[in-house]
Amino acid sequence: MTGWIRAALSDAGTIQVTQRNYGVPMRPLTGPLAGHVLIAFRGGRDLDVQEALARRHDAYLDCLRLAGLRVPDTQMRLIDHAGVQRPVIVQSAVPDDAMLPHLFRQGGTQAAIGLLDRVATDVAEFWRRIAQRPERIGLYSPLDSFAMDEDGPLFLDTFPPLISYNR
């Protein structure tokens, strides 16, 4: 997959999509990663630190799912770029018209309230389920971090992994 990521990030056929938080999402239009969003982040030279970050990301994905949040298929890979290990998130793409801000603009007030209620219910359930966990866990949950499909809310923002961290 590393080769596919490198190829997609350097391909002129990969388009930048709406920026989310700290990374720059890109969507390959062709190739094996078409149908995915790639989000490349600034990395570092300390491999031990970057590998710990990758392990935390895996643990965070597990925590999100065990706590009831639905997350599209998501992986984090470290890509070596001139000695710098860059974290790259590879996530199954969600259609633009399924993103919560788009749904708010398309529906009326009652539809928006219904969407907010579904997201709030999932977020509250997340906090209820992690309340007794010993490690520090966070959830950065602005509305643009969610999409909606026929089964309910999808949480998209898995980086940085908010698990076992210090302030």
Locations of regions flagged by a protein language model:
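Conserved kinase catalytic-core helix
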Residues: R55-L69, L103-D144
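Short loop/turn segments at strand-loop or loop-helix junctions that form parts
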Residues: I39-R42, V90-D96, D157-P160
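ATP-binding glycine-rich loop module of kinase domains
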Residues: D11-D62
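Protein kinase-like catalytic core scaffold
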Residues: H36, R70, I89, L154-L156
